[in-house]
Amino acid sequence: GTTCQYGLLDSFDLSRKIHDRFYKGYESVKLPHKFKIAVGGCPNNCVKPNLNDLGVVGQRIPGFQADICRGCKVCQVENTCPVHAAKVVDGVLKIDPNLCNNCGRCIGTCPFKAMPTGEYGYRIYIGGRWGKKYAHGKPLDPVFTSEEEVMQVIEKAILLFREQGKTGERFSDTIERLGFENVQSQLLGSELL
């Protein structure tokens, strides 16, 4: 990371690329309302990307190898997990995907190398806002593993907002009006680009 020990991506570099491509490159594009984008280096959420129209959060997806796990009574992976997603059950480590926030803190902690690596990625939140009204952005289902995928989703979100948003309406209102599932489907599909 570029700002703290928990950073999982170069948030300054990604922010600059987003700024150059979409703020400078799209400066003549008229949107229904302002569109804020935030980039956070990890799931600790310090810069609150989920409270912006679109937020990108660094991820590190655990690469657990169950065949190597020895089911230690004092599991270092379990002890390290800050959200308690990792638990040894019946002699094997289990990671609850509904609890795991892909912070990557568990990676490399197993002395037997059952959690040696993790794939870096990006979680994208849409529809957040703060101020007089606030809304927590919702995460898109996939964790993206390439920067170009992230840039394409951002571009699709801007185009969707331009084409389907109403004048004076914030992106969160557009999502609420159209439905999250519908918007997610469009952002993950190929029709907008």
Regions found by a protein language model. Give the residues of each.
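General structural feature for long, well-ordered alpha-helical segments within catalytic domains
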Residues: 10, 14-18, 22, 77, ...
